[in-house]
């Protein structure tokens, strides 16, 4: 069945100001072949992440959500088999995630009841990070809750992450609250209260996000949405979806994670 493979979308390009546009000198970094492989070759961040996902799940369906000007380079690095959801305009994470979700259902013909994970394109982590995402996908497909996030066990009171406060210390817990990126003192306070770093990973069934999308956007399918994309409001996924969901789950990841 399709249920036992991981659907994962790597958010790049037009999905947020931090990553837009990738063609600027400081942001072409995920394409630069500066990482050493075990056998001494060099690879880019994108190639490394792609290989890691397939080590964790050889049958994974990997899609990159990005701007049109990056598509050729992504195909060059990952081959023609990589799926690309092209964003025709610079919007925020909600439109990007909705467009990619519609692409999976309407273009790739993935069952809307399947689960998908959205992840930034540039996590520097070991394979266990992607194994945790795979496990989150399997979990959310079997429970009534709609949305799962990944929480990283903090190693220091960093100011660059948002924080997730879980209700319990279990591997998987309901979320009690979210905290915006804090200053150092508040970060330490959050950590003392058991907060986790928000890894920026969202896991949900495609049907869930498309239902929410149709409540906020008037469109019939992927092709219609693509045509209207330039008219969409800029709105973050957190603001459009996360803030309105009552029961959000967080899964812990105890390993190391850096966003390059």
Model-predicted regions and their roles:
Residues 2-73, 80-82, 86-91, 103, ...:
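N-terminal glycine-rich phosphate-binding loop and ensuing alpha1 helix
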Residues 10-12, 65, 117-120, 149-153, ...:
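Short beta-strand segments
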Residues 19, 74-75, 187, 209, ...:
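Hydrophobic packing residues within well-ordered alpha-helices of enzyme cores
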Residues 82-169, 211-215:
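Conserved beta-loop-beta/alpha segment of the NTase-like Rossmann-fold superfamily
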Residues 166-193:
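A short, charged helix-loop
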Residues 195-204:
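A conserved mid-domain beta-alpha-beta active-site/ligand-binding segment of alpha/beta enzyme cores
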Residues 209-256:
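Predominantly late transmembrane helices and immediately cytosolic-facing juxtamembrane segments
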Residues 259-260:
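Conserved small/polar residues in nucleotide/adenosyl-binding loops
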């Amino acid at each position: 069945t399709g249920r036992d493979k991981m659907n994962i979308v790597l958010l790049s390009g037009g999905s947020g100001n931090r990553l837009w546009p990738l063609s600027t000198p400081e942001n072409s970094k995920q394409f630069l072949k500066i990482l050493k492989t075990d056998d001494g070759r060099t690879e880019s961040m994108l190639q490394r992440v792609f290989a890691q996902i397939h080590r964790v799940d050889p049958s994974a369906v990997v899609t990159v959500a990005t701007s049109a000007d990056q598509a050729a380079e992504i195909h060059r690095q990952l081959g023609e088999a990589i799926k690309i959801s092209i964003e025709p305009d610079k919007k925020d994470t909600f439109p990007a995630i909705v467009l990619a979700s519609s692409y999976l259902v309407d273009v790739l013909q993935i069952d809307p009841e399947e689960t998908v994970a959205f992840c930034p394109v540039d996590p520097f982590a070991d394979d266990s990070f992607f194994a945790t995402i795979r496990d989150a996908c399997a979990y959310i497909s079997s429970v009534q809750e709609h949305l799962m996030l990944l929480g990283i066990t903090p190693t220091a009171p960093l100011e660059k992450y948002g924080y997730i406060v879980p209700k319990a210390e279990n591997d998987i817990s309901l979320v009690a609250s979210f905290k915006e990126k804090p200053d150092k003192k508040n970060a330490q306070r959050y950590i003392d209260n058991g907060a986790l770093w928000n890894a920026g990973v969202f896991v949900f069934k495609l049907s869930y996000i498309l239902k929410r999308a149709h409540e906020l956007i008037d469109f019939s399918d992927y092709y219609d949405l693509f045509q209207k994309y330039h008219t969409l409001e800029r709105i973050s996924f957190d603001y459009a979806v996360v803030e309105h969901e009552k029961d959000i789950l967080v899964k812990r990841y105890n390993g190391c994670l850096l966003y390059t």
